């Protein structure tokens, strides 16, 4: 299942789960996972609603507003699909047919790819925003939302094509016991692929992942370098209250830097643990830990973004004060 839902550069399908090692026997793991999913769905729904209302009210959008809103939508859909799939892992066999299995796993793969792509795009856009006028990136500062949407649409189609082999390899688990199938959930399995097809697909996924992560790393390094240069240039200024106050751009930059670093670290962790689990610890418990860890970014990211939005922070503070006052009275 790991290489269908949570793809790493290791062997394409690394989790072989037989019928005697079902994860639904451990209710604590399932409850923890569904709690994480619930928190993530709440946070992404709130962030998406905020950006929709912001657009309806006619606020001038920042260059990063569209990717952030899109990322919240992607994570919301991804977590919903993950929760639906998880019911067939932790709870009971639903008896899904081929169409449901193919649709859910294929949709999840595409959403995971779009999450990686949008996160990478967000880091690049932030680097463009901070780039000085003398930089070659400054000419992209006036890029329109139309171009961003076209890029996202192109990448969406590309990911759909790359993942299209899942529409063939994913099937409903037959009643006949066989050792040739890799179990994705209790209802869905993977048909064995030829060595050539598996190698090509693994190579394409690895190239895509390494390219986008490298792009995030370079843009993050560029942002850090710009911030260090800016700090050196302002060191000679007198340390007044005004100079110590963070600008909105600096706050947004620090937020995105933190998320990019967290995303890269979680991706590296997923790759390492997935490879080790494939070679050494191919058991349900280690798999369930990985299942929990790789959704942390989608769960945490909306709250990090919202912490940088003054309107949301002020709204939550006022709501908190009202609840405290109601409890006191």
UniProtKB/Swiss-Prot annotation:
Any GO MF annotation of the entry = pheromone receptor activity
Q: What happens when the gene is disrupted?
A: Mice lacking all but one V1ra and V1rb gene (12% of the V1r repertoire) show a lack of chemosensory response to a subset of known pheromonal ligands and changes in maternal aggression as well as male reproductive behavior.
Annotated S-S bridges: 101-188
User: Does the keyword section mention DNA damage?
Assistant: no
Membrane topology label: Multi-pass membrane protein
Residues on Extracellular side: 1-32, 87-109, 169-209, 277-285
UniProt-listed CDD domains: 7tm_V1R_pheromone
Task: From the record, give the transmembrane residue ranges.
Answer: 33-53, 66-86, 110-130, 148-168, 210-230, 256-276, 286-306
User: Can the keyword Ligase be found in this entry's annotation?
Assistant: no
Q: What family does the database annotate?
A: Belongs to the G-protein coupled receptor 1 family.
| Name of this protein | Vomeronasal type-1 receptor 43
Organism of provenance: Mus musculus
């Amino acid at each position: 299942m790991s290489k269908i839902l949570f793809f790493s550069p290791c062997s394409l399908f690394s989790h072989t789960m037989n019928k005697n090692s079902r994860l639904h026997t451990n209710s604590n793991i399932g409850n923890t996972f569904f709690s994480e999913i619930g928190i993530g769905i709440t946070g992404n729904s709130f962030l998406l609603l905020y950006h929709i209302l912001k657009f309806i009210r006619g606020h001038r959008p920042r260059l990063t507003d569209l990717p952030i809103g899109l990322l919240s939508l992607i994570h919301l859909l991804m977590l919903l699909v993950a929760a639906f799939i998880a019911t067939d892992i932790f709870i009971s066999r639903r008896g899904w047919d081929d169409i449901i299995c193919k649709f859910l796993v294929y949709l999840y793969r595409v959403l995971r790819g779009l999450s990686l792509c949008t996160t990478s795009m967000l880091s690049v856009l932030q680097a463009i925003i901070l780039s000085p006028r003398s930089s070659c990136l400054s000419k992209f500062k006036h890029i329109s939302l139309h171009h961003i949407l076209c890029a996202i649409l192109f990448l969406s189609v590309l990911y759909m094509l790359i993942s299209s082999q899942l529409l063939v390899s994913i099937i409903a688990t037959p009643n006949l016991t066989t050792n040739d199938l890799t179990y994705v959930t209790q209802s869905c399995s993977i048909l064995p692929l030829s060595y050539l097809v598996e190698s090509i697909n693994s190579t394409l996924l690895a190239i895509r992942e390494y390219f986008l992560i490298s792009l995030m790393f370079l843009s993050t390094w560029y942002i850090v370098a710009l911030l260090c240069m800016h700090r050196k240039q302002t060191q000679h200024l007198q340390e007044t209250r005004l100079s110590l106050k963070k600008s909105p751009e600096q706050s947004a930059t620090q937020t995105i830097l933190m998320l990019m670093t967290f995303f890269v670290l979680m991706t590296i962790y997923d790759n390492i643990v997935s490879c080790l689990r494939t070679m050494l610890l191919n058991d349900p418990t280690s798999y369930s830990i990985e299942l929990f860890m790789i959704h942390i970014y989608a769960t945490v990211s909306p709250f990090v973004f919202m912490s940088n939005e003054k309107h949301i922070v002020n709204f939550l503070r006022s709501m908190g004060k009202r609840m405290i006052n109601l409890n006191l009275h």
